[in-house]
Regions:
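Signal-peptide-cleaved, periplasmic/extracellular N-terminal interaction regions immediately downstream
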Residues: 1-132
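Catalytic-core regions of hydrolytic enzymes
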Residues: 111-258, 269-274
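Short clusters of hydrophobic/aromatic residues that line enzyme substrate/ligand-binding pockets
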Residues: 49, 56-59, 146-147, 238, ...
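Flexible glycine/proline-enriched surface loops and loop-helix/loop-strand junctions
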Residues: 261-267
Length: 275
């Protein structure tokens, strides 16, 4: 059992020995989430979790009337949960993921805004700072490449570089940085560029620290988005590896048509290049 904190939600990850069927429902007074998992039991005892800064107060286990494993999440307030199962990927086996979103924050986001009437004036050319979206690769469940000797994790290296780069951008007149992630949590690949677009970013920089077979490799590589896709075998291998991050980091694809998603993603990339 692991807990991750992101700015907009708290994530709980249950490692399971195989695929599981689960049923989730909410209780109030006090706020709780109940998860019944069929044909399951807890191996050993649950680890103590640091719940500071999260929506979770405590985790308890027991048995339901039907004999299923029952997990009760005591909450600090009203939440809107989302749960899904993940198949094995990378170093991880089967997982059950429960994301807890702050209900009040979500309600505020969806409230329709009624703009005040404006006088019609000649439009002036927009002048603003150049916004640079800085994306630290991987994060949370997805460590990225891991060093063989010191077990250095790519997600930590990329975040440190992103934070330093943001400082440099902030010091440059006419430029403003935005960090796609600013902590140890996972952001889905599609959500990364969606966040950049919501902030009207002009430049998107994704930072990675990949591993290669040869120990003599050093220096850096720069990849630019191409309408023709990966231009060589190394670029294709790197692209396939990074695009698989959602399976490791934990993004549900149950509600998406995978072929449609890929087509829309390709169209979106091409449109971005043309713009």
């Amino acid at each position: 059992l692991r807990l991750w904190r992101a700015p907009d939600h708290t994530r709980l990850v249950f490692d399971t020995s195989g695929p599981v069927e689960h049923h989730l429902f909410l209780l109030q007074d006090p706020h709780r989430i109940v998860i019944d998992i069929e044909d399951a039991r807890v191996q050993g005892s649950l680890p103590e979790l640091d719940t500071n800064g999260s929506l979770l107060a405590a985790v308890r286990t027991g048995k339901s009337e039907s004999g299923s494993l029952r997990v009760v999440l005591d909450l600090k307030g009203e939440t809107k949960p989302r749960s899904f199962a993940l198949k094995p990927a990378g170093e991880y086996g089967h997982r059950l993921v429960v994301d807890l979103y702050d209900a009040k924050a979500l309600d505020e986001e969806v409230k329709p805004s009624v703009p005040a009437p404006e006088k019609t004036l000649p439009r002036k050319p927009e002048t603003r700072d150049l916004i640079v979206a800085i994306d630290a690769g991987h994060g949370g469940e997805d460590p990225g490449a891991v060093g063989r000797r010191y077990r250095t994790r790519e997600k930590d290296v990329t975040l440190a570089i992103a934070q330093e780069l943001a400082k440099l951008v902030a010091q440059t007149p006419g430029m403003r940085p935005m960090l796609i992630r600013n902590g140890d949590y996972y952001v889905g690949l599609r959500e990364r560029f969606s966040k950049a677009r919501r902030q009207r970013a002009d430049v998107f920089v994704s930072i990675h620290a990949d591993a290669v077979p040869g120990r003599q490799a050093h220096g850096s590589s720069v990849y630019a988005l191409s309408e023709r896709g990966a231009s060589n075998a190394m670029a294709r291998q790197l692209a396939d590896k990074e695009n698989a991050s959602d399976l490791i980091g934990g993004v549900s694809i149950n509600d998406k048509d995978d072929m449609l998603a890929k087509v829309l993603l390709d169209l979106s990339h091409n449109r971005t290049i043309q713009d």
